């Protein structure tokens, strides 16, 4: 199939195979996106990816407006990211996102950030669709157009499991969920778990951790007014595993950092 590239008036670029699996957009790293070292922060990197996913989905009428008409909403269940380096404040970058074929209950969306030809970070994510009315998962069938050419491979980043049992593990902080943490699903936004988790550490400690790989799993929803307790453990492989536990002591969010 011959592929051409479309360019919209706002600078969006996307591969055209009757609207291909890829979507690209230039992104300047603004001050509000940066950490204390004037580099793109990890939460802002996750925000960038989610925003790109929304823009791409909107081309298929499964962005916020299209899903609202169906009374559905997207949820991310897992993300794994590898960081080579973070861009600096006011750098111009280009982000690309692309999708893999969906199965019955979930779909994979991948992403990468570039500075010219240099890949700065990349990731994989697993998504599902839920019904506002029932609160249950919705089958993926029919959401994506049949004519998409899925020809972009996923990054070579394994998706693993993180154990939910943090009994007796070190407590590193607590966080009470506020109104500003809530998204259109009525629960805590995914990226705000990451912000709350990293907020358990000082800027100096985050610098010392020098995070190159991060895997997160969103286990269940949390709501305004609830308090999360963050606990950590260090497996023999040298990684740092963190769990956010609700007031019943059950893990709602899991992360592995290295």
Describe the residue ranges of each PLM region:
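HotDog/MaoC-like acyl-thioester-processing domains
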Residues: 4-25, 80-165, 218-224, 233-258
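Hot-dog-fold acyl-thioester-processing enzymes
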Residues: 2-76, 124-126, 131-210
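Acidic/His-leaning functional-site neighborhoods
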Residues: 173-256
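Exposed loop/turn and edge beta-strand positions of beta-sandwich/beta-sheet ligand-binding modules
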Residues: 77, 107, 212
